[in-house]
């Protein structure tokens, strides 16, 4: 029963409207246009409300955050009392001086600093850098040369980064043996799995390093259960994302070596902006069509993924297609997250022996008709899965083919 689940995952993911960037909106490159709704115009000509848009130190062009007013000067000291008139001669005896007032109580202690954000030691204002004593950013985030913590290439890559950078993070993960994923799959195996990714349209956008760095944001991905379960989860994830990004070279003798060939698979000739949820208002000119390792689609998926990852993907959807780490993070997020209150792909896979009735999960998922009509795509997903299991040295699991044997005896036919 365990790996009937895997087939469901491939079908669910394929039928999910799985979840390409625009001209500047404001500022000097947009003819001096201002942002609507009092939003700030960033150095790069986009509208937003966070420090990267509004802080003049970050290059804000218009409608920026105002500098705080200087503190009010202290009130002037009271005027000294007028001098006492000279006493008559002979002066009367002076009265005894009044008792000195009691000492003022000490000032109250300053309040304690605000606690750091949940999950890490990062400052509440997300500032970092040498001028502040090199405070750490949260795990998976980097300190940029502009003294802000963040998780994109603008913060983490090369000369843009001060510390906790991608290169140093990757070296530490592998050399210290602290990352369970790198123990299961090496760079040489990954490159052999996706042997054509450098001569496909993606031109090497996807990489082992980007994948390993992305996994650090998901501590339960590929690390749950015994080694067999963990290898199968990686094989299933790679099969899912390979099917989404396949080069579709079905005239080839080897159909299953063409994963990670596309970044924006559905953008050519597609005018749909996929702004389908009013809960996530779409800025003018932004499109939410398929991007990245899981071909993320629809504004609500960009919104939810960005919320989970601490990124503004509604205003910057092209990060999924231009930053390989973010591309993999959105794919792993999609794998790990629940959708429509259904079990996540991760949960279904690791609980396949926990008594779940897989057929009921499929029937309740809302994708039954698509599942039946896309048997061929699911079979291709199985082909990818088998190849990756072989390369990771793990068995496929039981009952793998009984769901899609294309006969009236299959589980799908009985649904």
From Swiss-Prot:
Additional remarks: On the 2D-gel the determined MW of this protein is: 56 kDa.
Signal peptide limits: 1-21
InterPro entries noted in UniProt: Chitin-bd_1 (IPR001002), Chitin-binding_1_CS (IPR018371), Endochitinase-like_sf (IPR036861), Glyco_hydro_19_cat (IPR000726), Lysozyme-like_dom_sf (IPR023346)
SUPFAM superfamilies named in the record: beta-sandwich domain of Sec23/24, Lysozyme-like, Plant lectins/antimicrobial peptides
Keywords: Chitin-binding, Disulfide bond, Glycoprotein, Plant defense, Repeat, Secreted, Signal
Chief localisation class: secreted
Organism: Morus alba
CDD domains: chitinase_GH19, ChtBD1, ChtBD1_GH19_hevein
UniProt keyword annotation of Phosphoprotein present: no
Entry GO terms, CC: extracellular region
Example of a GO MF term: chitin binding
Reported function: Chitin-binding protein which slows larval growth when consumed by the lepidopteran species S.ricini and M.brassica, but not when consumed by the mulberry specialist B.mori. Lacks chitinase activity.
Composition bias type Pro residues, residue spans: 67-121
Pfam families on file: Chitin_bind_1, Glyco_hydro_19
Limits of the Chitin-binding type-1 domain: 23-66, 125-167
Residues that carry a glycan: 264
Subcellular location: Secreted
Protein name: Mulatexin
């Amino acid at each position: 029963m365990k790996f009937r689940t895997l087939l469901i995952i491939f079908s669910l993911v394929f039928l999910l409207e799985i979840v390409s960037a625009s001209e500047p909106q404001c500022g000097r490159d947009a003819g001096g246009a201002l942002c609507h709704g009092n939003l700030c115009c960033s150095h790069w000509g986009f509208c937003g409300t966070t420090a990267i848009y509004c802080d003049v130190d970050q290059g804000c062009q218009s409608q920026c955050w105002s500098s705080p007013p200087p503190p009010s000067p202290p009130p002037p000291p009271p005027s000294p009392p007028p001098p006492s008139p000279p006493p008559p001669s002979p002066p009367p005896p002076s009265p005894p001086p009044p008792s000195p007032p009691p000492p003022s109580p000490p000032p109250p202690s300053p309040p304690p600093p605000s606690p750091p954000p949940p999950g890490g030691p990062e400052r509440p204002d997300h500032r970092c850098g040498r001028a502040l004593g090199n405070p750490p950013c949260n795990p998976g985030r980097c300190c940029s040369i502009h003294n802000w913590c963040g998780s994109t290439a603008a913060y983490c890559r090369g000369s843009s980064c001060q510390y906790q950078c991608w290169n140093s993070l990757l070296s530490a993960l592998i050399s210290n043996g602290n990352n369970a994923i790198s123990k299961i799959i090496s760079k040489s195996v990954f490159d052999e799995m996706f042997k054509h990714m450098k001569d496909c349209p993606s031109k090497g956008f996807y990489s082992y390093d980007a994948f390993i760095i992305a996994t650090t944001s998901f501590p339960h991905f590929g690390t749950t259960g015994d080694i067999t379960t963990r290898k199968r989860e990686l094989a299933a994830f790679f099969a899912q994302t390979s099917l989404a990004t396949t080069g579709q070279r079905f005239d080839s003798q080897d159909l299953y070596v063409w994963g990670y060939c596309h970044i924006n698979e559905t953008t050519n000739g597609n005018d749909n902006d996929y702004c389908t949820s009013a809960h996530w208002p779409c800025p003018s000119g932004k499109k939410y069509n398929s991007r990245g390792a899981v071909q993320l689609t629809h504004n609500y998926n960009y919104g939810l993924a960005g919320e989970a990852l601490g990124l503004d993907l509604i205003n910057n959807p092209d990060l999924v297609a231009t930053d390989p780490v973010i591309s993999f993070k959105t794919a792993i997020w999609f794998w790990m997250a629940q959708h429509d209150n259904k079990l996540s792909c991760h949960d279904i896979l690791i609980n396949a022996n926990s008594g779940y009735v897989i057929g009921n999960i499929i029937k309740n998922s809302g994708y039954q008709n698509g599942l039946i009509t896309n048997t061929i795509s699911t079979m291709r997903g199985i082909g990818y899965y088998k190849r990756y299991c072989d390369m990771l040295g793990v068995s496929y699991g039981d009952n793998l083919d009984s769901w899609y044997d294309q006969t009236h005896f299959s589980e799908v036919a009985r649904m």
